[in-house]
A protein has these predicted regions:
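Long, well-ordered amphipathic alpha-helical subdomains in the mid-to-C-terminal portions
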Residues: 225-228, 236-324
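A general structural signal for well-ordered alpha-helical segments in protein cores
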Residues: 4, 19-20, 33, 204, ...
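Flexible active-site lid/hinge loop adjacent to a nucleotide/diphosphate
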Residues: 157, 170-198
Length: 327
């Protein structure tokens, strides 16, 4: 079994087998995976992370497939993290993005990884940020994160992506209302896919009107028409994303806190905060599960009304805190 240092070196060298094994270990929360990530983190931050989200049926995977083509023709290596709904029985991803994008399977410059949401309240599984970091450390130029279409939970994509792309299509009926419900506020680029359909002009007008209602200081959001199945508009989409990235690079930097390597952008700081918060919550969830397993009598006492759940929760927190203090 390779050490954490050896695994990190293999990942940085682009070893597919070692990287895939690490991704699996991260998804399964296996011991030792975090030690490897600690060694990889200083070598991340180079890839362009692009988030693709939107309503079910909008053609997100087709857009991703077309973007892979675009970036590969430009000589870029592309990693894809496709977050799927979980099977309630196996916990596995059931949409099968590898099947949808199987024509890229023999391309060494493309790596596609499906992740299951495992009931996570946001559209992203708990290990998504780590998998993105692995692909980054492997040397991929672009990492595309495609999320499930679950409404407002799509805001999770912002914590992972430099540019968030929201995809909609004409004819869904309530697609604009769904965007009003919260997705619009996270969009850096809006895509009207299947724009050869009737109603595309109206969808673009409605989106334009909604953007006009935003605060004047809000960042500009471009609207791009695509027909992803034919590759139409994909060049324009990629260029719109690049313009957003360039605007972010020119954004004012925030003064560094004590101990930081240097100034950074507010957006990058927010992404770092979201990542740290997710790992703290993940650590606490595991601690709760482990403590509950060891203190099964607490649940029994609550179930029989011998103890109220509020006091049980307080006792659980005290047990976790004592355990952490003893480490």
């Amino acid at each position: 079994m390779p050490t954490a240092d050896e695994t990190a070196a293999l990942v940085r060298a682009g070893d597919v087998r070692a990287s895939a094994r690490l991704m699996r270990d991260l998804d399964d929360a296996r011991p030792g995976a975090v030690d490897v990530m600690k060694r990889l983190y200083p070598h991340t931050g180079r890839a362009y992370v692009l988030g693709i989200t939107g309503n079910p049926g909008a053609g997100k995977s087709t857009v991703v497939d077309a973007l892979i083509d675009y970036y590969r023709k430009a000589g870029k290596r592309v990693g894809v993290v496709a977050v799927d709904p979980s099977s309630p029985f196996s916990g596995g991803a059931i949409l099968g993005d590898r099947i949808r994008m199987q024509r890229h399977a023999t391309d060494d410059g493309v790596f596609i990884r499906s992740l299951a949401t495992r009931g996570h309240l946001g559209g992203l599984s708990r290990s998504t940020s780590d998998v993105v970091a692995v692909l980054d450390a492997m040397g991929f130029d672009v990492v595309i994160v495609e999320t499930v279409g679950v409404g407002q939970d799509e805001v999770d994509v912002v914590s992972q992506a430099e540019t968030a792309v929201v995809v909609t299509v004409p004819g869904l009926g309530d697609e604009i209302q769904a965007i009003k419900a919260g997705i619009l506020e996270i969009a850096d680029v809006l895509v009207v896919n299947k724009s050869d359909r009737e109603g595309a002009d109206r969808t673009v007008r409605d989106l334009t009107h909604m953007l006009e209602l935003r605060p004047h200081e809000a960042e500009p959001v471009e609207i791009v028409r695509t027909v992803a199945t034919m590759g139409k508009g994909i060049d324009e989409l990629a260029k719109a994303c690049e313009r957003h990235r360039e605007r972010g690079a020119r954004a004012p930097e925030v003064e560094p806190a004590a101990g930081a390597n240097g100034p950074t952008s507010e957006r990058r700081r927010r992404r770092a905060l979201a990542t740290v918060r997710e790992h703290v919550l993940d650590t606490m969830r595991r601690a709760v599960d482990e403590t509950l397993a060891a203190r099964g009598e607490l649940v029994e006492r609550v179930a029989t009304r011998a103890l109220d759940p509020y006091s049980a929760a307080d006792e659980l927190v005290r047990a976790i805190t004592r355990g952490r203090a003893d480490e």
